[in-house]
């Protein structure tokens, strides 16, 4: 299982309705790969890392984007406003929505951008149809599940179904390795309802931390993701009890995705290693971990 580098990228809001993504540039493939494999493959990108990079969230929203295809004037206008951020966002969006083995291409002047598919969660939208409500929700959940607050490499397991109800493949080996039940992710970025996260197991105790801070840290760890408490109070399991199939918030029921971690992704202040989620200080908490990171100054 190879590791990949996480890029810090701003998660942008899709502020208007969604028309079709342009037709596939490659024939569709049926893939039996697990989500872990799909998350690790492709161009050295770690699609398990949508890290917020501090840019103005509202200022980089999809203003005026009708999404009538990647060749439309509206898409070009949106993309060229912030091409670097838009390019990174599209890599994650296409990875979530489009099946593995397909790419989406956009050209602007002498520059050509190619984005690879991965999880294939929105098959209708991927093949040119307007995004259904279910597709909007599951792609939003995917983007939320890929958030990594610290922009570092973290291998995760994503469980759930596509918009059409097809389970994301997961092997017994994957479930046996990724034993930390992290969280549930749901919402709708496309219509402005927002993006929500809950913790599956209990939140981490005061001395522990993780690069995957959004679910297990609780509170306001990853704005604009809104932490809604325990998944168990808002979500229902699938028939097998493996993952949360739906979650309800503010009277709206969403298609959700569930994530799992490996035990080694949880760090404890005092283990002698100063982790990216820890900092210097005089205490024994991650934000002031003297034993691992020393005193400041």
Question: What is each stretch, according to the model?
Answer:
Residues 267-297:
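Cysteine-rich modules of extracellular adhesion/ECM and protease-associated proteins
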């Amino acid at each position: 299982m190879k590791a990949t580098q996480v890029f810090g990228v701003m998660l942008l809001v899709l502020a208007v309705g969604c028309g079709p993504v342009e037709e596939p540039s490659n024939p569709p493939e049926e893939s039996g790969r697990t989500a872990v494999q799909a998350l690790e493959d492709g161009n050295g990108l770690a699609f398990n890392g949508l890290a917020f990079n501090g840019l103005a969230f509202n200022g980089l929203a999809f203003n005026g984007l009708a999404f009538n295809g990647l060749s439309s004037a509206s898409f070009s206008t949106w993309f060229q406003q912030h091409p670097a951020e838009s390019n990174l966002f599209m890599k994650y969006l296409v990875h979530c929505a489009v099946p593995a083995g397909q790419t989406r291409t956009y050209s602007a002047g002498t520059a050509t951008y190619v984005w690879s598919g991965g999880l294939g969660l929105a098959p209708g939208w991927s093949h040119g149809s307007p995004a259904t409500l279910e597709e909007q929700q599951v792609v939003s959940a995917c983007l939320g599940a890929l958030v990594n607050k610290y922009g570092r490499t973290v291998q995760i397991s994503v469980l759930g179904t596509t918009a059409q109800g097809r389970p994301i493949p997961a092997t017994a080996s994957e479930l046996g390795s990724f034993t930390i039940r992290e969280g549930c992710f749901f919402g709708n970025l496309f219509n402005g309802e927002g993006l929500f996260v809950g913790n599956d197991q209990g939140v981490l105790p005061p001395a522990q931390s993780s690069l995957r801070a959004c679910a297990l840290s609780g509170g306001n760890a990853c704005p604009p993701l809104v932490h809604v408490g325990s998944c168990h109070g808002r979500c229902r399991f699938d028939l097998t009890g493996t993952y949360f199939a739906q979650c309800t918030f503010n009277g709206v029921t969403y298609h959700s995705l569930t994530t799992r971690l490996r035990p080694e992704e949880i760090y404890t202040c005092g283990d002698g290693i100063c982790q990216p989620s820890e900092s210097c200080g005089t205490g024994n908490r991650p934000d002031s971990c003297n034993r691992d990171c020393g005193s400041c100054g």
